Amino acid sequence: MLNNRNVLAGFIVFFILLITGKQVTGQEVETGVSKKLAIYRKSVISRVHYALEFDIPSKRADKIVAMETMSFNLSENKRVLQLDFKEDKAKLWKLKVNGKVIPIQHHDEHLLIEARYLKKGANQVKIEFQSGEAALNRNADYLYTLFVPDRARTVFPCFDQPDLKATYGLTLKVPADWKAMANGPLKDSVLASGRKTCRFATSDTLSTYLFSFVAGKFEQQVGKVGPMRSDFLYRETDTAKINNSMNEIFKIHSDALKYFEDWTAIPYPFRKFDFAAIPDFQFGGMEHVGAIQYKASTLFLDGTATKDQLNSRSNLIAHETAHMWFGDLVTMTWFTDVWMKEVFANFMADKSAEGSVGKAVFDLKFLVDHFPAAYGVDRTTGSNPIRQDLDNLKDAGTMYGNIIYHKAPIMMQQLERLMGKEKFQQGVREYLRKFTNNNASWPDLINILDKYADADLQQWNKVWVNEPGRPVVDYTMEKKNGKISKFIIKQGAEYGGARIWPQFFEMTLYYQGYSKEVTVNLNAAQTELKEAEGMDVPLFVLFNSSGQGYGLWPSDRAMFNHLYTIDQPVSRASAYISLYENMLNGRYVKPAELLNLFVEGLSKETEELNLKLMTNYIGTIYWEFLSPTDRAALSELLENKIWSAMLVQTKANHKKLLFKTYQDVFLTKEAGDRLYQVWKSQTAPEGVKLSEDDYTSLAFSMALRPGRDSTLMKEQLSRINNTDRKKRFEFIMPALSSDVVERDQFFKSLELKVNREKESNVGAALYYLHHPLRQSTSVKYLPKSLEMLEEIQTTGDIFFPQNWLQTTFGYYQSEEAAQIVTDFLKKHPNYNPKLRAKVLQTADNLFRARRLLK
């Protein structure tokens, strides 16, 4: 018998559901992908497969029609099922569940399927829809997907969480002259009526953020990575770069693959190894299984490439190859542990180079690659731990940054040193075997490693992984009769409560004609170094001489006169880094003094990586920590010293680094005229090799200075032949205009998302827009730039918020700029804490400049 009262009650509950978005089952519907939702879905859903079809028209403005068949098993069927789809409901056209067409319910970024349409066991969902495009990166004649961390849901309905791995079938319908690449091998392609249908075999088991395809007008190179055939798609047209790079690109991949197979004792775990070079790619690379994507400019280098550029390419390829095991084969359970895949990729990429370059070069490269970048965040009041909490994947992009990419490998190096290399390797191998094709967390790994370690890793883990910051190290050295009678080393936290960072480091005592190195186990707030007692008093002491210790180390002023006599390149690099870090903290040395010290070494430093480090520091000190008045007074002398050092140095790459430094800092008319002649005649100084990209950079630098008309930029544009590079140049040009109104209009245009699509180009343009020589007119953009940050985080890719802030605030030093940041943070006391931290990280040099310039 029908109970009218129950019907009425049911209607009321249904009405409440519609207007509140709350599930009567107790499962709340909220934007993003909450951790609660992810945990529930993982507990009931398994054996997921997606069969997807995208019909991609030749015209970018035309919509992409898509079809999806999704199959999965349910172990329980008591709640409304939520599929993630961050698009308008109007783009969902037809929904069929287990053979039955049902009404479409969609709100708060979720497609909802009521339990009555589902069943325990196997289920099938078919959807006809218009594809979302937020993560499709559509261009005029190519596109590529980029779904990390939670952007698959912007393109098609799915379970967009890393621990619901799935297999994927894919069909792409594209223009006949396009090529396509995906995770699975290409089964076949059929041409008909000017269109091409590409069908791909079922992929390996992947998380949604690793599902990918690339399609468009690309060239294709077939080569081998190890024993496998490998297809490489690219759009580069510069034959010098292609001829100089192609064989090396495949070789670096093959070498990296062999190293990781040997080190992990696990053969390459997937069916194919293809990759694509993308113009103006947002990241360095992305580890999509079977279809890795790279930034084209990092892969393709000509004969003018510096050691830093060559290292960056090798590192990048090794990094993405390492991800095949660390991230793809074993994936983090939740993005709280996204750092795990990145730390292993970076750390293992570094290790893969050690055998070929030798320990000394490896140690130096590791130091200069990771420590300055890690300190750049960890010294700030906005620093974050390596491992962070995350309640919703919509905020997962804020987890990325230099802490996980650079401090985490340093932590891992200390962990390997603590355990020993063999035991560390044994533990990691067990971890990979145990969680193959599955998901794992940091506690899963640390519990395994703990079995192989003598030390208490749980306690060690607490300060290194779960807390932010770095130690500040100081010392006292007591002397008696020319001997060291007592040597005490102290450590304390730079910010926050008292903490101890257990670590090993080396300290070297330098004497006339010789030196003595001491290894220190710094595992307490105060360590008495018994080994030093009775030694002769040295000329000077260098802390962290091997470059493996992490913290703010003392700088012995007695070292200054002997700095360039230190024989080991890694020790000199460590000294340079410590000097710079201490300068920022107002210890031992002032900015102008340090600038002079570094400039004096430009003709003496013999190691290219060190010269690159020094020139970076010179540029930063010059623009950020000297007043405009002091810069103007110093400019002619500085220019002459840099140019003279360039003439003294004999190696082409050393000369090029110094030429680029000269280009960065020049202010005088004489220097401008000299550079203009180099650019106009396209004749580099003797011994310096410049590429088209270098002349483009030179044109940008000259356009910033007064007295250069717009014909310079137009002529440089006419020299560029590659279509993608031309578009990049045209995008950046307004940011360099001498007309303030045109620059205002450019900044205003960035308020529209469509004008921010090429994020790497936006970052380059913002750098020039906010260059110190333009800050008197660009400071007015700062309030709006901060106001836009939340939208930037919501609409952009993972690195864009940091890039937006860094290229905007990176060179400001004025009280006005500092006040804008302070006022913004005061005005928004409940601001997203992770974004607030990024503001503090980026503005740290600004606030330090205010203190140091007083």
Predicted feature descriptions by range:
Residues K78-V101, F504, T508-G513:
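Solvent-exposed beta-hairpin/edge-strand motifs
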Residues T171-V174, K179, S189, K196, ...:
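Non-catalytic accessory/interaction domains
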Residues N3-V7, T25-G26, Y40, F200, ...:
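Hydrophobic alpha-helical and helix-loop surface patches within well-folded domains
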